[in-house]
């Protein structure tokens, strides 16, 4: 935990190229994910009527972009998993296989131009070169454009004791304050948000390269974090102790059970 920028993160990382250059999870195999993508497109289309072009970072098989394409938007995806990017391209969802960063953003600007909307859903907290990604977003977004960042919300992790979400693929655990601090550093300013059911409680935070009037609900969320002391190390320390107590209670329960024990895990 950094007391200056209020970011919570893992103390060690695994190289992103090792983790994501070949990936197994494909968005299109989940009916829930497909329906959510449809709603996501409808919501952004209604909120930001001036949008004509969309770029998605970590676009996977293009399930989300497919919905935008149906509605006539110019689209482009970027995904580090070559096997999945290949699948998306076969389905005519133009996808660049690679890791998005500042250098790639410069190439995209030449070939695609500046998009009106840049989307990064559940990816920003997963990579160690996070500053280069945000620099790339700032370099690429239209001056009147919108950036939509979806992430598992720190408050939901703490409230639900969701320590199962803390592992090597998830490096950062953002609050509204911490991710806003990061983007503000590179000239992107939060102005609104929506709740998301993904990952057990996420938010979609909207940024602009221009300082816009904050929505009332965003101001309320800022005040909520202050009241809950979400960006206080003591809050995180208490969460850590609760996780350990929960683990100990579960171990005790399992050890006291008689007979066979069956486990089932799902993602």
Please describe what each predicted stretch is.
Residues 122-126:
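A short His-aromatic
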Residues 188-199:
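Conserved S-adenosyl-L-methionine
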Residues 131-146:
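A short glycine-rich, Lys/Arg-flanked "PGG" loop and its adjoining helix->strand segment in the class I
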Residues 147-172, 176-178, 183:
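Short, glycine-/aromatic-enriched active-site segment of Class I SAM-dependent methyltransferases
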Residues 92-107:
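Conserved SAM-binding strand-loop segment of SAM-dependent methyltransferases
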Residues 1, 6-87, 162, 167, ...:
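Extended interfacial segments that mediate partner engagement and assembly in macromolecular machines
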Residues 119:
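A conserved beta-strand element that flanks and buttresses the S-adenosyl-L-methionine
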Residues 44, 67, 78, 211-267:
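Hydrophobic, well-ordered beta-alpha structural blocks that scaffold small-molecule cofactor pockets
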């Amino acid at each position: 935990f950094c007391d200056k920028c209020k970011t919570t993160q893992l103390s060690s990382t695994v190289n992103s190229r090792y983790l994501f250059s070949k990936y197994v999870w494909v968005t299109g195999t989940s009916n829930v994910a497909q329906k959510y993508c449809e709603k996501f497109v409808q919501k952004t289309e209604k909120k930001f009527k001036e949008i004509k072009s969309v770029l998605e970072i970590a676009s996977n098989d293009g399930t989300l972009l497919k919905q935008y394409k149906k509605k006539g938007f110019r689209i482009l995806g970027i995904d580090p998993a070559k096997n999945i990017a290949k699948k998306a391209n076969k389905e005519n969802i133009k996808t660049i296989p690679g890791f998005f960063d500042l250098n790639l953003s410069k190439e995209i600007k030449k070939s695609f131009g500046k998009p009106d909307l840049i989307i990064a859903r559940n990816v920003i907290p997963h990579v160690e070169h996070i500053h280069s990604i945000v620099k790339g977003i700032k370099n690429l977004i239209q001056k009147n454009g919108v950036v939509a960042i979806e992430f598992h919300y720190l408050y939901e992790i703490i409230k639900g004791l969701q320590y199962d979400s803390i592992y090597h693929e998830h490096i950062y655990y953002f609050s509204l304050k911490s991710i806003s601090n990061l983007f503000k550093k590179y000239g992107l300013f939060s102005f609104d948000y929506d709740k998301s059911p993904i990952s057990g409680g996420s938010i979609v935070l909207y940024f602009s390269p221009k300082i816009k009037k904050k929505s009332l609900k965003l101001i309320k969320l800022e005040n909520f974090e202050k009241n809950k002391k979400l960006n206080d190390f003591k809050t995180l320390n208490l969460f850590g102790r609760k996780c350990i107590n929960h683990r100990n209670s579960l171990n005790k329960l399992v050890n006291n059970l008689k007979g066979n024990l069956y486990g089932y895990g799902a993602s």
